[in-house]
């Protein structure tokens, strides 16, 4: 192992010595390492990953006490012992200890929850750890990149992120994108023997390589500290700061008013003045806000991961809740990505060749292992997959790349003659074969015929290679035939797209296929056929006829785009964002990375390449669109909880500051800071459960409407403050409660008034959460069991304190059950108007007519599914108008008012569509006369056939 020590200390220049010497120095062969040798070397070189900075748990815990809201509380704690020290009384130790306890409780909850969420996320991310193909014990297998050691043989192909620094072995040159490391925007060509760096992306080609450096010894590992590690302040952070600042400013205004009135005007005692200021500071600060919101997000992201969507960035959840446009890849997301070939429709262009031979050539130009979807479909068409290589010797395989858009195999037949077979995009193959105009016309006619049925075309060509070498150009290429490929839609795609529209998310299909195929898939999925070829709108060769049209508007209104190149995806996202949309983009390939990064929510679909995963915000672990839609719903629930809480926090700040300010200044009554602390601690306990509360997701895309949050908070908070002031006046200055309810008068007992006031503030402060958490009447929308239990427990504690506690230091004395009952009754009566205030604010802010507000399925709606059917009808009419179709003759209102007739109408339409489809099938030449017999022979159901296949 002496030589390996030198390598570990980087004494050997493995980058530049000849490749044979690399094997000597690394003591390995082209057959790779054994597992034992691999384990031995891992102990020596360490795992192939960058060392993560271990965060100190104590510092992390203390970090939760380091934010503007906590600073205000810490200032209050210092005030309690440093300033509250006059008037012949000792420092206020009770309040000091209480504040510290409150801070510790908050930090502990944040710390535990974030830790749990972090562990869950780490476990999930481990499943997504970069994988690599490595040769161990003489066998190729997919392993985690972390196990690589110098001397391993790895395979690198299109879309892979290179897992370690390596030297390339024999094969075709690779195109490598090193922009992540060097900033070069263009891919560089790497020839056999060259070094490739860890972290760069393979853009073209496929080759084997020998690992020369791993982990911290790689070029990437050494430069890792230079890599961009800026933490961009998310939108969420900005909102948090804005709400925190609003609360702090409200308290500051209250304190300034108190100081001006109490000392120069009323000449109050120093100590009681300081205590009044402490009441505002302790009661007004929503100290639990960062905790509640981060816990809600952490629990939410865990829930999302259980549904198959892993969030890499917590704040992507709030963007997901506000997403109103989803650009979805067609292949694999809307469709199954399981291609099949319709053998009857294969077109042959060369004399003396039959359909079976065309299929055989296509299978030869495919991989037999490590296949992509098209390779698998071609080889799968043969009776036995081994036929693809039967009787021939493979010389060289050219893998698919986005530039040539074809694959090719050079092989030697049984007689020793050399041939090449190639399959790929028809345009590329036509150019390759240098076909005459009439052949091109015929090919295009067949492609169009396929496309009308939603079939993609694949062209096959062959050539002789008389020079008998893999580098030679060979003889002229012959265009052999065209194959129709069909990728059936997923069974749930159509239903999911309908769901998305109900949720206010517009799904746009993005496909590299021709326009006709895009439209056919759109028609099958019921998402509309208003599609454009993206090159006509965006590329260099824009369509002159579309020049005059507003491109941005066309992009906004389109149902999808066909013939899309990766750079168009980026452009589409950018244009939609300029139109103020929040855009989600799905992607899987290495070339989708820029668009995924640009989109508000980049979604890497299941089986995406490493490059796409690293650029995305959310990684899906299951295929299909339905995962995305359920993630949208979950995100909206999470967002709803956070929004409910922020409205609550603002209301409570206003209610405490205004209520206690008025009582202190009008009646010169000093409330005990310790009792405000008790209210704050009990409130926090209850509020923590909101992260698991049962909520209805918003029926439309949701966003932080700060105006609504502040307006609602100010109105509800002021109303509650007024209720408290009126209650205090009735108890302190009148005999109202004594006369009406027969309770004894406590107007002269300051300590009993303290208990009564404490209970009144405590009940309504916490009951307010039920108002802010609901979109309609708070007593109709059922809250989560946890929230109700926490509320009941906290109020039991508060009531028992008010009834029995006799604490001299807190200046409270028990008031008995009679008064407790009266206070509960008072609180319940004045609770009901809160909902009406809530609706009123929403009405004023929405700026819409009252009926429209009702229609917007908020507050009073009794409609099933929030009036979904009317929305469907409105949407259908809008779509017809958009596509220039006449609205139905019948007065649509009467149609859609009656639910049963709406259903009936749908059924009639379905049947009509089915009849038309059967008629069309019968008309097709291929089926004249045999439709029924073919169907019966194969034991198929004609209805299912036309939903899934174009026969």
Swiss-Prot record:
Coiled coil: none annotated. GO terms for cellular component: plasma membrane. Its EC number is 7.1.2.1. Its main location: membrane. It is found in: Cell membrane. One of its GO terms (molecular function) is P-type proton-exporting transporter activity. The keyword Transferase does not apply. It is a multi-pass membrane protein. The plasma membrane ATPase of plants and fungi is a hydrogen ion pump. The proton gradient it generates drives the active transport of nutrients by H(+)-symport. The resulting external acidification and/or internal alkinization may mediate growth responses. This is Plasma membrane ATPase. It comes from Oryza sativa subsp. japonica (Rice).
